[in-house]
Amino acid sequence: MLRIAIDAMGGDFGPEPIIEGLVLALRKNNNFTAIAVGNKEQLLPLIPQGLLPRIEILDTNDVISMHDNATDALKRKDSTIYKAIELVREGNADAVVSAGHSGASMSLATLRIGRIKGVSRPAIATLMPTSENQNTLVLDVGANVDSDAKNLFEFAVMGQVYAQYALRLDEPIVGLLSNGEEDSKGNEVTKEAYKLLSKLPGFAGNVEGSDIFKGTVDVVVCDGFIGNILLKTAEGVADTIGKIIKKNLKRSLISIAGAVLMRKVFKNLKVRVDYAEYGGAPLLGVKAPVIISHGKSNSKAIQNAIFQAINAASSNLDSIIEQRLVEYSNKID
């Protein structure tokens, strides 16, 4: 049975939504147990009596806050995220979920759990909604500010494997984010990456930013600098559109009546753009599943992040990524 380590104190709102999300996940899935890392006195009252046999509490009080430096994470061995990562490193857990300091989670996972053989740099992946009934996996969205062509090639392989085995897509199509579809477009790094990716099965060529939300391809590859700007921009646009709609709906009785009639449409729209539906962002390229959740995650987001961790841990992703990198690297050397 899978064991999932949970950083129970790392989120912006304390342990309540994290434990609530864990409880939701445990009630819906009987095939895993959890280790909640955090202050035992705070965590124990939040756990229903009937679920105590499936939740072990690893007691610790130190929490790395969003204001702390990620480089301090290695020194603070009693912190919740350090101990959660160590559980995986020592083989006592199969995956980690944290809504805490993303930089600390990433650096600790990379240095303590270690990179998959053949991976130069891990990448953070996230799902973006599309106008179709599907999502687009985008990576990297923040792990690496600077990436070379080989890094982008590795991101593509990792993203393709994740899409195939964790998201259950048969033959994931990969696109390289650029400022035009022609192979002559892009900067020197993306042009060089295009040459490498052209030898990858399922590579569709360059894609533009708008293609992400059209569902043109299944996986979009970019460096972490561009990816993080893309992610924050998408979040901002979605939030702004929501506020504009809400503001205009209150302007007249007719618009209010129209809103009532379109309630189901608005509900479906909210589901499509709500980050809680997607859970968290997997850190691809390390030897065990690490899911980085939004600091403002509610219980639903944590529940879905745990399900992501379970899917990834059940899919043996690390060995598949290693095999694919060996196979495809032979074609580009």
From Swiss-Prot:
<comment type="similarity">
    <text>Belongs to the PlsX family.</text>
</comment>
<dbReference type="GO" id="GO:0006633">
    <property type="term" value="P:fatty acid biosynthetic process"/>
</dbReference>
<keyword id="KW-0963">Cytoplasm</keyword>
<dbReference type="GO" id="GO:0043811">
    <property type="term" value="F:phosphate:acyl-[acyl carrier protein] acyltransferase activity"/>
</dbReference>
<dbReference type="GO" id="GO:0005737">
    <property type="term" value="C:cytoplasm"/>
</dbReference>
<keyword id="KW-1208">Phospholipid metabolism</keyword>
<dbReference type="InterPro" id="IPR003664">
    <property type="entry name" value="FA_synthesis"/>
</dbReference>
<comment type="pathway">
    <text>Lipid metabolism; phospholipid metabolism.</text>
</comment>
<keyword id="KW-0594">Phospholipid biosynthesis</keyword>
<keyword id="KW-0808">Transferase</keyword>
<keyword id="KW-0444">Lipid biosynthesis</keyword>
<protein>
    <recommendedName>
        <fullName>Phosphate acyltransferase</fullName>
        <ecNumber>2.3.1.274</ecNumber>
    </recommendedName>
</protein>
<keyword id="KW-0443">Lipid metabolism</keyword>
<dbReference type="Pfam" id="PF02504">
    <property type="entry name" value="FA_synthesis"/>
</dbReference>
<dbReference type="GO" id="GO:0008654">
    <property type="term" value="P:phospholipid biosynthetic process"/>
</dbReference>
<comment type="function">
    <text>Catalyzes the reversible formation of acyl-phosphate (acyl-PO(4)) from acyl-[acyl-carrier-protein] (acyl-ACP). This enzyme utilizes acyl-ACP as fatty acyl donor, but not acyl-CoA.</text>
</comment>
<comment type="subunit">
    <text>Homodimer. Probably interacts with PlsY.</text>
</comment>
<dbReference type="InterPro" id="IPR012281">
    <property type="entry name" value="Phospholipid_synth_PlsX-like"/>
</dbReference>
